[in-house]
Amino acid sequence: MSREFSLLRRSVGPVEPSRLESPEEPPLRTLLHLSDIHFGPKHLPAVSAGVVELAAARRPDLVVISGDLTLRAKPVQFREARAFVAELERIAPVISVPGNHDVPLYRVWERLLQPFGAWRRHFDRELEPVFRDDEMLVAGVNTAQAFALKGGRIRRRRLAEIDTLLAEAPAELFRIVVAHHHLIRPPGVESEHPAWNAGEAIARWGPGRVDLVLSGHLHQTLELRPFGEDGFLALHTGTTSSSRGRGPESGRNSLHWIEIGHGSFRVERHFWESQSGRFEIGLDQRFRRRPPR
């Protein structure tokens, strides 16, 4: 049995809420997780405006964007994405990592020589940002690459850097890793290969090390726990504001609202409802936190 298949076989669902602290307990931190915004021909302006409205109403402590802010990494798409992120930054800090669509596709020389030049000009020269406060550590991983059109890769250098970040962080911090590409091939999606070195990342971020891995790329929402309750939750957001939803989420847009508590964390899956013109909760789950070690 392959390691990948065994991980999927051992994945489990949410922990029963009755075994955790009261859902009414005020959260320590709140996050808004977005992905696959895709400014360009497939972008839905009304939906991205709804994202800003939700953020303004709920005031997260941090906004996390796991890549693909553009469709084809064109200058106009980056300018539109920058304006969108600027609106969010007026509400909360924003941490984002590139996706494969944020690397130029047809501008071959730029792709080979400066694949992240446009990203750095519009967002941050740091492609793998880190956010840290008294309650959480969020580490970005750039899985996009110049020499692959779709697939991703986790660089071993970054794995070593995250090892150091985790070792130096206080044990009680809630630990989050953000990457565009997925670590585990989801059931029934045979064409989507995990990022290179995903198996090594899973092993390094296993029980007692990381609480949550946030990703996108698949354009479907998904939750997997490769080590059961003792390990991290791999949480995928679908496409937040484009018409490129896939599979059962074709034509749908999603995001996640995350509340970090003392012994657990809550994940609200939101879907855009065109009739109401806003994001509404489609699923509300609570998961056990990693015990401090």
Where would I find each of the regions flagged by the language model?
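N-terminal active-site segment of His-dependent metallophosphoesterases
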Residues: 2-86, 161
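Active-site environment of divalent metal-dependent phosphoester hydrolases
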Residues: 40-43, 71-75, 80, 98-108, ...
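Extended active-site neighborhood of metal-dependent phosphoesterases/phosphodiesterases
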Residues: 22, 79-161, 169, 204-206, ...
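A short C-terminal boundary segment appended to hydrolase-like catalytic domains
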Residues: 260-293
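Residues at alpha-helix caps and immediate loop-helix transition turns in enzyme cores, especially N-
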Residues: 43-47, 76-78, 108, 154, ...
